[in-house]
């Protein structure tokens, strides 16, 4: 629960009324729902103080649960599309690829293939036109890492695709998402429409050529 960063566990529909009445209205922590440290046996109210999470830093999922995924203004307020602006106005495509190389960015699949190499190969490949393909299908059983990003932060995916398209010389992009993820598809459609309305997607992005 934000902004206090209180972390409740095993919450069910039956617990919602108590959280609203006691925590949100009464400003009291619902202690019975707090995480209990398995070693000390003590209740830990804050997410950032749980041993398993305290040394972790969210990167891809940093906005998950913190912004409204269907509101582009929430994404902008969290720094969204600033990287796109920097890339388009301050960097060449080659510089973008080199930045990705220095960052050590890799694919999220099991192979962990270096992203810079993939982008460089695409940029240097002969033939035109080129297309940016976002494969949001999850072939591993029980894997939902792509689905979570699409449902919780679709604008981050779109921004990344635009930057990739700029770097590799692609002017069109496609997202492959299975029909079993209707919420992800819905939110992607909303995000795409919003990005187009704000001049962040389509022809002449941010008034560029």
Segments and roles (model prediction):
Residues 1-209:
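Feature of Fe-S/electron-transfer and energy-metabolism proteins
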